[in-house]
Amino acid sequence: QKALEGIDGEIIVIDNASSDDSCEMMKAKFPHIKLIENKDNLGFPKGNNIGVAQAKGEYICILNPDTVAAEDTFSKILSFVKSSEVEIFSSNSQLGIIGCKLIDGAGNFLPESKRGVPTPWVAFTKIFGLYKISNYFGKYYAQHLSENESGKVDILVGAFMVMKRELYLE
């Protein structure tokens, strides 16, 4: 909620048939947030589709239910989107999906934040730990980029993805 302060945005929460009182808690504590209560557990992807269909913004963020966004996350991402850096990373000046540096509850960087395509060779180097020896073997975790560096990657983890709504609907 604080991450959207000063930003014209909305929060849509999809509940996939929770058996606890989380929907009642959401209604009581966050009455301005749009809550969609599914009668059945349709799964994360279908829940995303339902939420995006209701969204009104130009950009959407797919966010795992256990992910916490820092207060400046969305303002930084929107600034990045509007900057010239986007053209550097996209060959045809069309923005794809933006991810961010993910950290765990202890504050440690999650290398899964950015990955390469797991070809048989790339998977082999990961399984046998070769990526720890040299960045030459670091394609699985896209080690061509440091944890604090922006750049193009093949795969983003689904815990946090920002994109134009139009792109998602394609």
Annotate each PLM feature.
Residues 1-8:
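Short, acidic, metal-binding catalytic loop of nucleotide-sugar glycosyltransferases
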Residues 15-24, 40:
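A conserved acidic beta->alpha catalytic loop
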Residues 37-55:
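Glycine-rich, basic loop-to-helix element that forms the pyrophosphate-binding segment
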Residues 60:
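Short aromatic/hydrophobic "clamp" motif used to bind/position activated sugar donors
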Residues 64-68:
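The conserved acidic donor/metal-binding loop of glycosyltransferases
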Residues 71-112:
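Conserved donor NDP-sugar-binding/catalytic core segment of glycosyltransferases
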Residues 117-153:
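Short, flexible, basic/aromatic active-site loop/helix in glycosyltransferases
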Residues 142-170:
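Aromatic-glycine-rich donor-binding/catalytic loop that engages nucleotide-sugar donors
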